[in-house]
Amino acid sequence: MGPKAKKSGSKKKKVTKAERLKLLQEEEDRRLKEEEEARLKYEKEEMERLEIQRIEKEKWNRLEAKDLERRNEELEELYLLERCFPEAEKLKQETRMLSQWKHYIQCDGSPDPSIAQEMNTFISLWKEKTNETFEEVIEKSKVVLNLIEKLKFILLETPLCDLQDKNIIQYQESILQLQELLHLKFNVATEILLRQASTLADLDSGNMEKVIKDENVTLYVWANLKKNPRHRSVRFSETQIGFEIPRILATSDIAVRLLHTHYDHVSALHPVSTPSKEHTSSATELVKDDVENVEKAISKEVEEESKQQEKQSHLIQEEKLKVEEEQDDIEVKMGSAEEESEAIKCELEMKVLSETVSAAQLLLVENSSEKPDFFENDMVDLFQFTTLGGVYHLDILELPPQCKPVKGWMIVEILKEGLQKYTYPPETTEDFETENAFPPIEVTLEVHENVIFFENPMVVRWDAEGKHWRTDGISNVSYKPNERLITFSLDTFGPVTLIQDAHINMPYQSWELRPLDVNKVLLTVTTVFTEIQIQIKENLCMLSSVKLKDKKHISILEGTWMTPIPFIIALKEAGLNIFPTRYSHFYVVINNKVPLVEVKAYRQMALLSSTFAFGWSKWNLLCNSTKVVFKVREHLPEECTENPNWALLMFSGDRAQRLKIKEESEAFSEALKEETEFHSTLYHMVRDFASKEAMEKVRSSNCQFVNSVCHMLLSTRLLSYS
């Protein structure tokens, strides 16, 4: 046998301990090398980051230093531009005085609502007048409603520093007296009308039906003369307005009245906000002291010069001609001193007026720290809801004795107690067998055509004892929006009204303020339900358009120019409320900003509004309460508005900066845009990228226009309620 063949392949070589240690050492060296490289890379990156941060900080500090260096200069220039606000207020004061003078020389017999004696005389004389028909009362009501409106505007438009507490009480008492007397006159006129019910009876039904319509009041009255138990459905001719009355009323000597007043004289008057006047009064006292000091200094200087000249004239009698010439010089000096005194007084008066205006503007954006008094479940909180479309006074009345013809005369028994209400249901029901003898009365009303309800209206009734609106005692409410008819069942008759959430259009989804022409802008506010466009020019505002769910709504207010405060009231009464109150933040989730920052932003936006467009930015939600962010661009008539070139500005009240981010960016950053600087005002911020023509237009803006734009911005509070 030959030798054995060797196995193919050899055994795996065994790794020695030394080799294993060597491998581990190599692995460790590689790991350490990688760690060292990573450390060096991190240190390098960190050094680069710190270097960039240092450079940025140095740049930031340089920009801050530059901003501080020119701050006083910029603020002085802003102060001169903002003189338009006290100038506009001065024009308002002159307009009010001119209005009083025009009323005085007009001599039309109507009283001056601001003079208590004239108002008391007017009320007393009208009280003494008797036997007025409904048509006569309606005609007189136009004068009365105008007086009430004037008194309300006095309370709203007069600066609080010019309103004394006794004046506020006087005006509010006059309003209440006029409201009560007007309603009393309507009741007396209704009684006179019902005395003639038998002569006005319908030939078919035998009952009396009367409808009297006016711009402010509509009367529907039905007298049950036949007492037919089957005649239980009352519908006024050519309308769907009416009642479904129970059998007991159909067989009673009663009349049913629906008096629809297109105004609300039932709800309590809103209290006039009277902030602490310490700031304004202290400023006033300071200015008065300055004026007195200036006058004393000037008069002392003139007196010393006069004494010195008199002494010289006694010593040198022979130089009489020279003395006379010097006396002329003194007279010139005295004249120039008086002119200087007047100029200083005027400047100081403007200063205190500016302080007053600023305090009033700040009041418009201040939030109340305390929520209104607690309301029961069935009570209506009029800080949360608002009445719309006026008040429907529903009354069941006892039919008064009817006129009877006797030998060519009309004889009527006049009850001493006057018009009496029929109690339904009666206070005691023991004499009646069935439980449902007094069911609720079904009522169908027409909603006022000039009012917008974004949701189905709520029906509420007036509680005369508690002096508030309530939701109980009303059932089976149904609303037909196309016909504008609302039907409901009412346990007891009395005043009813329709209410809507006052903040239904808050918060806003977006807004834009855009120039239209010289001293004319368009403010657009977009909400969940509507888009409202308002034009502003000089001291006037106008509703330009209202869009509801992609369709245009025609409002009676469109095309009517009004001053800001009456305009705001008119929009609220039409259901277009985009004007928060100091209590609104309790009912709306808002992006609350510091009041002083808001005021400064609105004032400076108004100054620039004749040339620059402003718009809503989503980043305003992400910055804190001490800063506001919005879009801005110079408005060029020929530019394409599809893709406007907006700049993002952030403003803290003391500093304005242009942000690096855009509206489409993914995250918020306060980083400064390259090659831009800090400024103390919005005016100087936009001047960096605006044309000379634009800035010239800003400087020549009409003071009343700027003031009106500012008032509208303060009233809508776009930066907090968007």
Curated annotation (Swiss-Prot):
Stretches of the chain forming a coiled coil according to its record: none
One Pfam family hit: Casc1_N
GO CC terms in record: axonemal dynein complex; cilium
Gene Ontology MF term list: beta-tubulin binding; microtubule binding
Sequence ranges of Basic residues compositional bias: 1-15
Entry PTM: Ubiquitinated. Ubiquitination leads to its degradation through the 26S proteasome. Ubiquitin-proteasome-mediated DNAI7 degradation occurs in mitosis.
Keyword Hydrolase: no
Keywords annotated in UniProt: Cell projection, Cytoplasm, Ubl conjugation
UniProt-annotated location(s): Cell projection, Cilium; Cytoplasm
Stretches the record annotates as Disordered: 1-20
Main localization of the protein described in the UniProt heading: other
InterPro entries: CASC1_C, IC97/Casc1_N, IC97/Dnai7-like
Functional description taken from the UniProt entry: Via its association with the multisubunit axonemal dynein complex, is potentially involved in the regulation of cilia function. May act as a cell cycle regulator.
Family the entry assigns: Belongs to the DNAI7 family.
Subunit and partners: Part of the multisubunit axonemal dynein complex formed at least of two heavy chains and a number of intermediate and light chains. Associates with tubulin. Interacts with microtubule.
Protein name: Dynein axonemal intermediate chain 7
Protein's organism: Macaca fascicularis (Crab-eating macaque)
Gene that specifies this protein: DNAI7
